[in-house]
């Protein structure tokens, strides 16, 4: 009945990483046990799936929950699962006002915009879900969400210039 061993089997059964062009899955946190010489009675695992396709995200979450339940039943462990939607993915057309405004601000600073869809979660997701079209502008961060994530001072200064151009254009 080692909860950590059951959790490790569940994680091993999950598909993690980039699953397709629109979908990622990750296990970001695991915690359990009280001491190295005590069989772990409890274990908490936090995982997520992100997709620009809501149905696809739901499928992946279901697979992860199923893997957890199966691993727990194999180890004769009890499992409690809760699923929480943190945000929804979104896409805006290039003709949307905030997309055009961001593109103009970037060009004004000598940067040709690159249009990409991302499964990232930010305040913008909440605004879009509430009916307010918002665009995220990349800030030059490298290796997002990795232990060695970084952004250069030059990239931050460039984003400040772009932000000032957006403010000036909206005045």
Residue ranges and their predicted role:
Residues 1-171:
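Metal-dependent amide/peptide-bond hydrolase catalytic core
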